A protein has these predicted regions:
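Recognition helix of helix-turn-helix DNA-binding domains
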Residues: 205-240
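Hydrophobic residues on short alpha-helical segments
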Residues: 199-200, 230
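Short, low-complexity N-terminal regulatory "tails/caps" that precede and couple sensory modules
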Residues: 1-22
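Short amphipathic alpha-helical boundary/capping segments
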Residues: 183-191
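Short, locally clustered residues in the helix-turn-helix/winged-helix DNA-binding domain
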Residues: 200-204, 246
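PAS-family sensory domain signal
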Residues: 20-76, 169-178, 183-184
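The N-cap/first-turn positions of alpha helices
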Residues: 194-198
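Sensory/regulatory domains in signal-transduction proteins
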Residues: 46-70, 74-161
Length: 251
């Protein structure tokens, strides 16, 4: 069974103690609190040097029946308690490989990167699949990730995994293969404006007939746009399409 050491990779450990300026950390926490107030997503700040949560929002999606303070107290033991063992092993492997990939970028580029994955959280007999996204906030003087922000929402997938590593402004991204234990570089996705409009209107709850009327196109044409959007995004449902388009910042 994995332990906490698997979540904190030695290659990301700073040799020197970061500058724990209380004003900076207080500003970070207040910013995270403000963001948590206006989003449906769970939000947390992780301190990789002290190996603890700096902040955890009170969104019940992430808490698994605990209070935010209880989760802060548990730290990454929370994952050992509430992530199924098979998913824990997946996360440990992902941590090792993702920190290695992060390390390939310089300090400025690291802060433009984010990673998205899907895994289960369990609370007693109840289990839910979440989407987890993580990006650096502060780096140490050595360029190691010191403070990171995590964002949690319900997954649009049916299974765990589906890992993607993105760098803002890049025309490529990487997906992780747990079968091959490697990152695979992929070309960025682009959609035509008509395809994006179909996704936007579908997300708003409009039917194919209503979308056709709004866009002054036939229903068959709307279905054509939707099918091409699905093919480009590699998905099979409108929920997955909207989620993937959002992740890739296409809207």
């Amino acid at each position: 069974m994995p332990d906490m050491k698997g979540f904190f990779i030695s290659s990301n450990m700073a040799c020197n103690v970061p500058d724990y300026n209380p004003d900076v950390l207080s500003t970070l926490t207040r910013t995270a609190e403000a963001f948590a107030r206006v989003t449906y997503q769970g939000v947390y700040l992780i301190d990789y040097y002290r190996q603890e949560f700096l902040y955890v929002s009170d969104n019940p999606l992430f808490l698994c029946g605990h209070t935010a303070e209880e989760v802060r107290g548990l730290g990454y033991r929370f994952y050992l308690k509430h992530v199924p063992e098979t998913d824990q092993k997946m996360l440990v492997e992902l941590n090792r490989s993702s920190f290695k990939l992060f390390g390939a970028f310089d300090a400025a580029a690291k802060c433009q990167c984010y990673i998205s994955s899907h895994f289960h959280l369990s609370n007693g007999t109840k289990r839910k699949l979440i989407n987890h996204q993580l990006t650096p906030v502060l780096l140490t003087d050595e360029g190691k990730i010191w403070i990171g922000v995590g964002i949690v929402s319900l997954s649009s997938h049916r299974t765990a995994g589906h890992v993607e590593f993105h760098r803002r402004g890049s025309g490529t991204y990487w997906t992780y293969s747990f079968e091959g234990h490697q990152w695979n570089e992929c070309s960025g996705v682009s959609l035509k404006e008509e395809e994006l409009e179909v996704l936007r209107l579908s997300a708003a709850g409009l039917t194919m007939v209503e979308i056709a009327g709004r866009m002054c196109r036939s229903v068959d044409t709307i279905k054509f746009y939707r099918r091409h959007a699905f093919d480009k995004l590699g998905v099979a449902s409108i929920t997955e399409a909207v989620s993937r388009a959002t992740l890739n910042k296409l809207f």
